């Protein structure tokens, strides 16, 4: 009763045999391969011992233990590398050595794990913390004030230095600005002239001058016929007086009339498109002002040229009673009456032509044909393009 019984420690239950298979096996350590030269027989011979001829075994052979099944991971990792390596359980490699100890073992190669792409190729394009600049004001490193540049904006100076004659000379800024502004204004106002603009302007000027000549010709023709009828008297009874007075004016007046008539005819024909004769005739039938005026001037020019010989005879007039006279007695009426009528018709024609032109002074078909030919010269091409589209 005096002695207390000491309680024994509680024994642990035995582990089942199946738990061994579930325990993960560690990899066997590499063993140094033993050379085949150091066999037991060689060792005995070197020591001076002789082997007996008896072949009976001195000690019983060890029984081979049955190989137990290991986990799939350990078995596959060992068998794939070297099937001749023995299996190790719980690190006890002394008990599980095979009889083939002299056999050389192949060294197992360690499989290198593939590195990630991020480790092999570092991201050099990434943004570092040093590259990030905050939105606030950047700190200016402290430097010597002698080497610091002024942070103020530069102010304009009144004088500028301009290179003249390979030297820089001071000049006032305001004068330079004024000259540059004047040059800019001059360049902006000055238009750019082309050959078509020059020809079109010359055509307009000639048309205006021609219209003035047409009006002057109409007035001159009327004045001429009035002078003739005044000098001839009533019913042309005083023709010798007309010849004696008008012989000084006959030749110059007829030449001046011819000059004005030619200029007016050219101006009138310049208003119609002579390249298309059919259109000109159609305009004459439709009483187009330019076409009608051209026709009147052409007829008047033809009539004036038909009476040029009579004007020459009037210029060399001498009385029939004198020797060498080109005029015979009682022939003045036969020669002068047709000439007076023709001058009257010419005056009427040029007056009507000027009236037609003055009603439509801006009409000019030749300008449309010469300076705007693209609209009418290629109508078939435009039709072909429309058909293809």
UniProtKB/Swiss-Prot annotation:
The chain crosses the membrane at residues 211-231, 248-268, 284-304, 339-359. It is found in: Membrane; Cell projection, Cilium. Residues 1-116 are annotated as: Disordered. Keywords: Cell projection, Cilium, Cilium biogenesis/degradation, Membrane, Transmembrane, Transmembrane helix. InterPro entries: TMEM237. It is a multi-pass membrane protein. Coiled coil: none annotated. It comes from the Eukaryota. GO terms for cellular component: ciliary transition zone; membrane. Pfam families: TMEM237. Residues 105-114 have a biased composition (Basic residues). GO terms for biological process: cilium assembly; regulation of Wnt signaling pathway. Residues 47-57, 74-84 have a biased composition (Polar residues). PANTHER family: TRANSMEMBRANE PROTEIN 237. Belongs to the TMEM237 family. Component of the transition zone in primary cilia. Required for ciliogenesis. This is Transmembrane protein 237. The gene is tmem237.
């Amino acid at each position: 009763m005096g002695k207390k019984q000491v309680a024994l420690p509680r024994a642990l239950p035995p582990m089942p045999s199946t738990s061994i298979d579930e325990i993960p096996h560690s990899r066997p350590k590499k063993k140094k391969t033993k050379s085949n030269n150091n066999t037991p027989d060689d060792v005995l011979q070197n020591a001076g011992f002789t082997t007996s001829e008896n072949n009976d075994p001195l000690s019983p052979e060890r029984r081979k233990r049955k190989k137990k099944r290991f986990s799939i991971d350990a078995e596959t990792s060992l068998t794939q590398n070297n099937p001749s390596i023995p299996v190790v359980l719980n690190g006890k490699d002394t008990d599980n050595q095979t009889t083939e100890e002299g056999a050389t073992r192949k060294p197992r190669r360690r499989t290198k794990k593939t590195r990630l792409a991020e480790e092999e190729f570092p991201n050099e394009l990434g943004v570092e913390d040093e590259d990030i600049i905050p939105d606030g004001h950047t700190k200016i490193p402290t430097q010597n004030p002698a080497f610091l540049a002024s942070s103020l904006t530069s102010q304009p100076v009144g004088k500028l230095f301009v290179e003249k004659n390979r030297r820089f000379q001071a000049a006032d800024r305001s004068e330079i600005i004024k000259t540059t502004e004047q040059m800019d204004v001059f360049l902006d106002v000055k238009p750019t002239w082309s050959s078509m603009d020059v020809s079109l302007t010359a055509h307009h000027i000639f048309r205006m001058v021609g219209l003035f000549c047409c009006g002057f010709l109409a007035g001159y023709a009327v004045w001429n016929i009035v002078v003739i009828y005044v000098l001839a008297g009533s019913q042309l009874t005083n023709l010798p007086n007309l010849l004696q007075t008008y012989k000084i004016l006959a030749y110059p007046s007829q030449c001046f009339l011819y000059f004005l008539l030619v200029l007016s005819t050219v101006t009138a024909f310049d208003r119609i498109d002579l390249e298309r004769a059919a259109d000109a005739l159609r305009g004459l039938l439709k009483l187009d002002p330019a076409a009608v005026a051209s026709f009147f001037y052409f007829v008047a020019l033809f009539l004036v040229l038909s009476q040029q010989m009579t004007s020459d005879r009037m210029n060399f007039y001498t009385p029939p009673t004198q020797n060498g006279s080109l005029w015979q007695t009682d022939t003045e009426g036969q020669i002068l009456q047709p000439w007076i009528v023709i001058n009257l018709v010419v005056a009427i024609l040029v007056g009507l032509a000027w009236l037609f032109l003055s009603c439509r002074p801006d009409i000019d078909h030749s300008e449309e044909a010469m300076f705007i030919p693209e609209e009418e010269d290629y109508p078939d091409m435009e039709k072909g393009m429309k058909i293809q589209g």
